Amino acid sequence: MDKKSAALYKKMQAEIESYQNLQKSCLKMVKQRAVLESQLNENKCVLDELNLLGPDNKVYKLFGPVLVKQELEESRQNVGKRIEYISKELKSSTDALENMEKDMLKHRESVAKYQQQCQVAAAMQ
């Protein structure tokens, strides 16, 4: 293998490594997104249940091992804020995932280009 082929091979290996790292990050992001979606659904169900309650119903919040009485409206507001926060995090993770996918596509194209160049260099020898 001459110097040019070795350099091309090294560049291709670096691109492959970058691509694999992006794949790992993407997988982590997908898992994180699944957790967020689960939390969002759970909180929406809680809010639906809270909306079914009347003013005479009592709501308790768990603080460590103790149940503490909480106002119904305060509970609704807290759950609503949690839903907003989780929704923002979900949007942020979706945007990050889209950017990672674009980067992965660029790296995939670079790897293909380097593979082609390596094949051409090998054929010339």
Curated annotation (Swiss-Prot):
CDD domains, per this entry?
Prefoldin_6 (cd23161)
Q: Which UniProt keywords apply?
A: Chaperone
Tell me any Pfam family this protein matches: Prefoldin_2
> According to the lineage, what is the superkingdom?
Eukaryota
User: What's a single GO CC term here?
Assistant: prefoldin complex
A molecular function (GO) term: protein-folding chaperone binding
User: Biological process GO annotation list?
Assistant: chaperone-mediated protein complex assembly; protein folding
What the record says about family reads: Belongs to the prefoldin subunit beta family.
Summarizing the function annotation, the protein's role is: Binds specifically to cytosolic chaperonin (c-CPN) and transfers target proteins to it. Binds to nascent polypeptide chain and promotes folding in an environment in which there are many competing pathways for nonnative proteins.
Q: Fill in the subunit field for this protein.
A: Heterohexamer of two PFD-alpha type and four PFD-beta type subunits.
Any idea what this protein is called? Probable prefoldin subunit 6
Q: Which gene encodes it?
A: Pfdn6
